[in-house]
Each structure stands twice: as C-alpha cells, then as structure tokens.
C-alpha cells in the first residue's frame, strides 16, 4: 500500500471513529468492585426501556463489578438472574468488541438484542451493531474471550 493511500485510510478512520475513540478511555474502569454501567440500573433497560440512574442504597456486587439499582425490586431481580441483566462484555462497547477492541461504553447508548443488554461508545456503533446484531454479537463474544482480562492503563 502506498504511503499516500495509507495516509488517506488513516484520515478516513480518524473521521469515522475519532469522536467515539477520543471520548472514552481505552478500557472500562477496573479494580476491585468497579462501578458497572457508570451507576445506571441494568434492570431498568429491560423494565423501563431507559437508562435509569441507580442509588447506593441498592447495590449488588457481581463478578467483581458493583451495580446500582433504582429500587429494591430491580436489585432483587438482578440477584435472581444476574446473567440476564448484566451488560454483555463487561459493559465494554459491543461494536468495538466485535472489531477486537476493548473500549469503554456510554451506558446511555444501548440496545437490547436477543434478550441481552449491549452498550456502545457511540450511536454509529450502536446502529452498525443493530443491523447485524446476531453476527456482531458472535464476533464480539469470540473477541471477549481474549480481551476480557485486559487491564486498564
């Protein structure tokens, strides 16, 4: 590939992904009991169809992640079936994960597909994922196996 062509591809990539990539750190917050979904209630995406802030009074730690809930009912629903409500890929951007990149997501940009919660770094990624949700989810799941233990920098 010529230097000019490589440069043009770099410019295209920067324009297409630059805003999304510049907004969020490379990896979601890590460490003991990191706060999942930046404090949003994971059950509310399913029951209220909206990102809803949780409160510290209703917290649960699951797989080293601390989740907050808007009310006791949501907390109890999560405790009964955490795998149903927890975001896929540890709350990392699902579209980036499908592309082999672990990137923190914005929990206000989300999608429920095939009964699972996916969050995204930007609305363009959300739309690309939605168009081929099953295939993108499979690619992301395959990449998650190797990227899930990637540490924060």
Enumerate the language-model features and the residues they cover.
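Charged, low-complexity intrinsically disordered segments
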Residues: 2, 21-153
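Cleavable N-terminal signal peptides
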Residues: 14-16, 26
């Amino acid at each position: 590939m010529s230097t000019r062509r490589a440069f043009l591809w770099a410019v295209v990539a920067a324009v297409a992904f630059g805003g999304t990539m510049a907004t969020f750190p490379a990896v979601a917050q890590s460490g003991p009991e990191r706060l999942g979904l930046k404090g949003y209630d994971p059950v509310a995406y399913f029951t209220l169809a909206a990102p809803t802030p949780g409160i510290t009074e209703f917290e649960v730690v699951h797989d080293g992640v601390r989740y907050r809930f808007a009310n006791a009912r949501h907390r109890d629903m999560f405790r009964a079936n955490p795998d149903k409500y927890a975001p896929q890929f540890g709350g990392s951007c699902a579209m980036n994960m499908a592309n082999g990149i672990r990137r923190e997501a914005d929990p206000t940009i989300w999608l429920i597909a095939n009964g699972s919660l996916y969050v995204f770094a930007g609305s363009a990624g959300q739309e690309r994922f939605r168009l081929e949700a099953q295939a993108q989810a499979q690619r992301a799941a395959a990449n998650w196996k190797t990227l899930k233990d990637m540490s924060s920098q």
